[in-house]
């Protein structure tokens, strides 16, 4: 008689994905972020569900309902701060996961990589709409500024913006639909993540050496189940420490003022995890050009499989590419800093140089470095 996990239709799927899955024997802790992203998604859906029970998506009630959650609902303050900071944790794990993929050449699994990019877009859309819901000053003006960018699209832009707003400005209709979309999108993300996993399991995981590991596989359980569990415990400990001691560190003080269409905040800026893209947007003095650069700053990830010129998949033994990779990481940190600064010298020129460097490293320097490293290996 076969054991249940191998015969039961449902258990069989779980077994193939999480128990008997053959995994490379040498994958490092950088491979933990997939499971950590799953944990983040579960935390966000669970905390979001409880927040939605008490939240009201009406312009006159939204701000008060969030205050009510924090003051009157049992542990409402905790649920709210877990949800708000959970988004930051989500993006930290997401960016580290993408960085790992770039460093170790995981983008060569094209289907998995492209679905990952779709997941990134979905997550960014969800986070943006979630930021609008508390209906504070930065919520309102962030929504106004970012949705207004679509008006730069020739011919259909203005109509498109008014269609998204449901009127001639960000108002009740906008808030209601953003709440509806913010509620449904995480479930779409969860479904897309399943497809992401499906394609990953077609090829098997990459490994730090970037070489086929078919000759040396180990079962996912117990080795990587416990490794993932350890990662989850460490991340949860750090996350809860942050939530309980510094809940407002990453938030904007302006969002504690109710939305006021007649009063513009001095510096309109998104949450920290969008600042790098916001800096790229602002570094181009033309509206349409800025919007195109903003979209391309994420879409450029899709070009990685086609720009890979090196004979080796991983950057582990490619020092020139390593140097460029860490320059790219530093450049993204500079862009994040610039995105939070006012539009004045010297920040404007720093942002423009950092934006040019961002695209240059990905589109020009990394492919050239790969070719140089191929030549060096032949000597």
Swiss-Prot record:
One of its GO terms (molecular function) is metal ion binding. One of its GO terms (cellular component) is mitochondrial inner membrane. GO terms for biological process: mitochondrial electron transport, ubiquinol to cytochrome c. Binds 2 heme b groups non-covalently. It is found in: Mitochondrion inner membrane. Heme b b562 binds at residues 83, 182. It comes from the Eukaryota. It is a multi-pass membrane protein. This is Cytochrome b. It comes from Chaetodipus nelsoni. The gene is MT-CYB.
């Amino acid at each position: 008689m076969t054991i249940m996990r191998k015969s039961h239709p449902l258990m069989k799927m779980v077994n193939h994905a999480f128990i008997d899955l053959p995994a490379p024997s040498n994958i490092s802790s950088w491979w933990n972020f997939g499971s950590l992203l799953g944990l983040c998604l579960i935390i966000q859906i669970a905390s979001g569900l409880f927040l939605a029970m008490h939240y009201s998506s009406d312009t006159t009630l939204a701000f008060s309902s969030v205050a009510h959650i924090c003051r009157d609902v049992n542990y409402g303050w905790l649920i709210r701060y877990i949800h708000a900071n959970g988004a930051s944790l989500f993006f930290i794990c997401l960016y580290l996961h993408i960085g790992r993929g770039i460093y170790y050449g995981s983008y060569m699994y094209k289907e998995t990589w492209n679905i990952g990019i779709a997941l990134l877009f979905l997550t960014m859309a969800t986070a943006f709409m979630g930021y609008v819901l508390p209906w504070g000053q930065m919520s309102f003006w962030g929504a106004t500024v970012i949705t207004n960018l679509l008006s730069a699209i020739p011919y259909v832009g203005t109509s498109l913006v008014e269609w998204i707003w449901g009127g001639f400005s960000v108002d009740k209709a906008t808030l209601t639909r953003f709440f509806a979309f913010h509620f449904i999108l995480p479930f779409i993300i969860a479904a897309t993540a399943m497809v992401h996993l499906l394609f990953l399991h077609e090829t098997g995981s990459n490994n730090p050496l970037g070489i086929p590991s078919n000759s040396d596989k180990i079962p996912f359980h117990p080795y990587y189940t416990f490794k993932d569990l350890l990662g989850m415990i460490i991340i949860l400990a750090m996350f809860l420490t942050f939530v309980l001691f510094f809940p407002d560190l990453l938030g904007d003080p302006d969002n504690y003022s109710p939305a006021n269409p007649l009063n513009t905040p001095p510096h309109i800026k998104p949450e920290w995890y969008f600042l790098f893209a916001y800096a790229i947007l602002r570094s181009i003095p033309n509206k349409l050009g800025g919007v195109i650069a903003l979209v391309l700053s994420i879409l450029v990830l899709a070009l990685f499989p086609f720009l890979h010129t090196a004979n080796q998949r991983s950057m582990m033994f490619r020092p020139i590419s390593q140097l460029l990779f860490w320059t790219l990481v530093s450049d993204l940190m500079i862009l994040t800093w610039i995105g939070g600064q006012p539009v004045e010298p010297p920040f404007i020129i720093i942002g423009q140089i950092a934006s040019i460097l961002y695209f240059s490293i990905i589109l020009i320097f990394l492919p050239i470095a790969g070719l140089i490293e191929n030549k060096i290996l032949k000597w």
